[in-house]
């Protein structure tokens, strides 16, 4: 996937890829990835033995029903986003059995957006259900609340800075 912005001049002294909603990126390269999340969800995944990782930024665009993510029409965007990232990681040598995750975002907005807290809750529910179904260990979760988060991810080490 082509990344919107690549910065070579930053405090990390390595390439920094900035992701926007809908972007995903997986790499073996010694670099950083960054984004800002509000209602959207940033998922950072990495394969520690192979020192590769990736990030995706998406939002489940509505309130999910009670039938679970496999049959929920609204959850399809989240599933598609996650599978794009997982596929990219596997293409460059990742092994799903070793993948670990860190998840951020799904905050709600006090800006008058209708159903903001319900959408945030749907995003939280979606991502937890996805990782449970995929049997992927979530090492860190910082979700919900009424604030934004700035995330920097080092994909080779799986380190996240806020």
Q: What kind of feature is each model-predicted range?
A:
Residues 1-29:
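Basic, amphipathic N-terminal segments that precede the first structured/catalytic domain
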């Amino acid at each position: 996937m082509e990344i919107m912005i690549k910065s070579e001049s930053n405090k990390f002294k390595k390439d920094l890829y900035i992701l926007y909603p809908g972007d995903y990126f997986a790499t073996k390269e010694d670099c950083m990835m960054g984004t800002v999340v509000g209602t959207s969800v940033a998922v950072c995944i990495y394969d520690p033995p192979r020192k590769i990782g990736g990030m995706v930024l998406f939002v489940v665009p509505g309130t999910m029903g009670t039938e679970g993510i496999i049959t929920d029409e609204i959850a399809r965007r989240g599933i598609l986003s996650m599978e794009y990232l997982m596929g990219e990681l596997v293409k460059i040598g990742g092994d799903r059995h070793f993948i670990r995750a860190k998840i951020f975002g799904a905050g709600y907005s006090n800006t008058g957006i209708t159903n903001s807290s319900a959408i945030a809750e749907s995003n939280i529910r979606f991502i937890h259900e996805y990782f449970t179904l995929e049997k992927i260990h979530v090492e860190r979760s910082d979700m919900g609340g009424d604030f934004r988060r700035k995330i920097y991810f080092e994909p080779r080490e799986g380190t996240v800075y806020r």
